[in-house]
Amino acid sequence: MTGKSVKDVDRYQAVLANLLLEEDNKFCADCQSKGPRWASWNIGVFICIRCAGIHRNLGVHISRVKSVNLDQWTQEQIQCMQEMGNGKANRLYEAYLPETFRRPQIDHAVEGFIRDKYEKKKYMDRSLDINAFRKEKDNKWKRGSEPAPEKKMEPVVFEKVKMPQKKEDPQLPRKTSPKSKAPVVDLLGLDAPVSCSIANGKTSNTLEKDLDLLASVSSPSSSVSRKVVGSMPTPGSAGSVPENLNLFPEPGSKSEETSKKQLSKDSILSLYGSQTPQMPTQAMFMAPAQMAYPTAYPSFPGVTPPNSLMGSMMPPPVGMVAQPGASGMVAPMAMPAGYMGGMQASMMGVPNGMMTTQQASYMAGMAAMPQTMYGVQPAQQLQWNLTQMTQQMAGMNFCGTNGMLSYGQSMNGGNGQAANQTLSPQMWK
């Protein structure tokens, strides 16, 4: 190879490299794959290696394939490639290709498409002469390609022209913005009421009427609330209920009783309503209708219980048992004569036969009874004289410092003697 031929090869390679830089030549003319490195120089198209194998199978009379880098090119071959190219060749061989046609990707389908395109010339415009198309239309395609960039530049110019129009658009709402504020103020009605109130005094009158209506509506509610408060018992009246139950009222309570009489009917009813939870405490001072001996001693008759308040507070005689159904009451029970002596010895832990605090714990607040009371016959009827008992109880000391029976105080001094003297058999009738 001479030096002249080496220079020609380098020059041809440079021409092919420039042709591959064109946008249409960057993709295969048949399958549109990227980066074709082969060419069919008699047709004038750049193709991929897969399509190059199919072109070889078509035959040399249809397609002649060369490698861009591996084969040597001649001036005639380079001239054919310059005259056609992928874009111009597809306009000739794909003139009647449907717009919705999708290029195949499978080898078998690609081979069928290539044979239809170049061998059968199925999509080719047969009215055109290929040689005339290469020479004559070569300049036309170049001229057609030259104004194309000018048309592309035109929209850029129009965009520059439209830019000032876009600037004017935001100025329109700025001018109309102060006009739009006026109806907003009218809708709120901030200005109109002020002028009307200054011109005419009717607005203030209407407001006063509205306030009067509100006051008239609120007045019945206040009266109802006053009635409800009046009907409810006051804390003073509620707190005075336990004072009515006091057994030993103080002299100052008389003035309170006179003030209580002046209460209305509603307050009296409320007092009775608040007194209902304390009814069980009154039952402790009530006596049953009759206390009978148990069935084990049918020979002894029943004994009528005391009707006075002090009867329930006094300790029962020996042989009395609790009767079911009567709260806080006991019934007498006959005991043998021999049992009485042991009863006195076991139950009486203090002089004069007084009961100990442990044995009389359920009888808290009860008065001490003399020993002679335990000798009463079971068949006798027990009757208490209310007037005598109240006088005697006034002189007795029931409670000590700790709230329990003060046996020491009652046994010492004249109190103990008075108790033994006052509670004499004269009481029993």
Curated annotation (Swiss-Prot):
Residues 217-231 have a biased composition (Low complexity). It comes from the Eukaryota. GO terms for cellular component: cytoplasm. A zinc finger (C4-type) spans 28-51. The modification Phosphoserine is found at S127, S219, S223, S225, S231, S240. Signal peptide: none annotated. Residues 138-181, 217-263 are annotated as: Disordered. Residues 163-232 are annotated as: Interaction with clathrin heavy chains. Keywords: Cytoplasm, GTPase activation, Metal-binding, Phosphoprotein, Zinc, Zinc-finger. Residues 138-172, 253-263 have a biased composition (Basic and acidic residues). Its main location: cytoplasm. One of its GO terms (molecular function) is GTPase activator activity. Residues 340-429 are annotated as: Interaction with PICALM. SMART domains: ArfGap (SM00105). It is found in: Cytoplasm. SUPFAM superfamilies: ArfGap/RecO-like zinc finger. GTPase activating protein that acts on ARF1. Can also activate ARF6 (in vitro). May play a role in clathrin-dependent retrograde transport from early endosomes to the trans-Golgi network. Interacts with ARF1. Interacts with PICALM and clathrin heavy chains. This is Stromal membrane-associated protein 2. It comes from Bos taurus (Bovine).
